[in-house]
């Protein structure tokens, strides 16, 4: 068991409650809705580093209904909490989402499996180039990656210590992303929303 897996296995319930209180789901859903992503009834989506399912739930809250979303995380307990949320949420059915325990650096999927990949606050736990390369591998050509990294800030400095991760500079994110993706857009969440205190968003298209 890795340190990251052990950490999130221990705090899954508390982490989920914190995310509900600070409104992350609504913030992500609002932006995803504005993107008008090319998600069709036969599309496959991956939420890489899904945690307790916040971004997956935001996707469905935004009105998207792909054929299937795979919610992948290294933490079994986080996936258990996520599965319970998927069961209880009115906008998601059991057939919509499949929780998968796995490692971001060795995704258990074939090359070019997904039309859209979402990842939020997960690449901070792995070497950035390796993580982006693996996400690019499973994404179809011209597919979309919605990348929500931690951005350098006072809040993220505190979170680095609390959650034992490494914040990548935005310059590093742009440079490394450019090896595999075209940067289509960069969204700054409003500072009035808690997600804006520590996160930003890049919209990327696989080359």
Where are these regions (language model features)?
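Conserved SAM-binding loop and adjacent beta-strand
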Residues: 14-31
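Conserved beta-strand signature within the Rossmann-like core of class I S-adenosyl-L-methionine
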Residues: 143-149
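N-terminal, positively charged/glycine-rich alpha-helical extensions of SAM-dependent methyltransferases
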Residues: 1-14
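A conserved beta-strand element that flanks and buttresses the S-adenosyl-L-methionine
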Residues: 118
């Amino acid at each position: 068991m890795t340190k990251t897996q052990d950490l999130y296995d221990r705090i899954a319930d508390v982490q989920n409650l914190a995310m509900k209180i600070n409104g992350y789901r609504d913030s992500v859903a609002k932006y995803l809705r504005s993107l008008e992503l090319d998600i069709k009834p036969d599309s496959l989506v991956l939420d890489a580093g899904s945690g307790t399912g916040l971004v997956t739930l935001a996707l469905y809250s935004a009105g998207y209904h792909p054929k299937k979303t795979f919610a992948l995380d290294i933490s079994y307990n986080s996936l258990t909490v996520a599965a319970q949320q998927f069961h209880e949420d009115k906008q998601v059915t059991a057939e919509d989402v499949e929780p998968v325990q796995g490692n971001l650096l060795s995704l258990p999927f074939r090359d070019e499996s997904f039309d859209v990949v979402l990842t939020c606050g997960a690449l901070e736990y792995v070497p950035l180039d390796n993580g982006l390369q693996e996400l690019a591998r499973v994404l179809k050509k011209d597919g979309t990656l919605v990348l929500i990294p931690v951005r350098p800030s006072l809040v993220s400095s505190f979170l680095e210590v609390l959650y034992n991760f490494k914040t990548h500079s935005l310059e590093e994110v742009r440079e490394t992303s450019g090896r595999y993706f075209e940067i289509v857009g960069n969204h700054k969440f409003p500072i009035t929303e808690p997600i804006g205190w520590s996160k930003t968003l890049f919209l990327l298209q696989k080359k």
